[in-house]
Regions:
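Short loop/helix-cap segments at secondary-structure boundaries that form the rim of catalytic
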Residues: 77-82, 112-117, 131-133
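Core catalytic region of metal-dependent phosphoesterases/phosphodiesterases
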Residues: 2-95
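Histidine-centered catalytic micro-motifs
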Residues: 9, 102-107, 120-130
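Short active-site oxyanion
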Residues: 64-67, 99-100, 120-121
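Pre-active-site segment of Zn-dependent metallo-hydrolases
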Residues: 21-22, 102-117
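Conserved small/polar residues in nucleotide/adenosyl-binding loops
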Residues: 134-141
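A generic structural signal for short beta-strands and their flanking turns/coil linkers
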Residues: 89, 118-120
Length: 145
């Protein structure tokens, strides 16, 4: 299954349109949104709250393909503007035999791993920096990954 991940859009309609273009080009089966979708304090302070509605409209066009979790900036108002659920702190997905734990990153991250007794792929945003890492639990070695 082909997946696309995005995080920390923060109500930026321009970059949300870029995301939609990439989604339409790549045609993944699911778009996984890792939180902080609409809220942007700087947009509100400059009287550009309509960016929030524009961004919501762009995302709502893709609602049938979206799986989303709550970011630390997502609010009940954001949920009211979106036609898909965003208020879960995390979701677990099984994709092609792989266990994914998707979250925003403010609650679970490489420093505070999610509770699990099996191997999971932790996917999160929040840092605004793309990075990949492998973490071994105490009972694991690279040989049994």
């Amino acid at each position: 299954m082909k997946l696309m991940f995005a995080s920390d859009i923060h109500g930026n309609a321009y970059f949300c349109n870029k995301l939609k273009e990439a989604y339409n080009k790549e045609q993944p089966e699911k778009l996984i949104l890792l939180g902080d979708l609409l809220y942007n304090k700087s947009l509100l302070s400059f009287g550009r709250n309509n960016e929030r509605q524009k961004t919501a409209g762009i995302l709502n066009d893709l609602m049938d393909y979206i799986i989303a979790v709550r970011g630390n900036c997502d609010t009940d108002l954001d949920q009211a503007l979106l036609y898909f659920p965003i208020m879960s702190d995390y979701k677990k997905l099984n994709v092609d035999g792989y266990e994914f734990f998707i979250t925003h990153g403010h609650l679970y991250n490489k420093y505070h791993l999610p509770p699990s007794d099996k191997k999971v792929i932790l996917i999160h945003g929040h840092t605004h920096v793309p990075v990949s890492y492998t973490h071994l639990r105490a009972h694991e070695t690279k040989a049994n990954l």
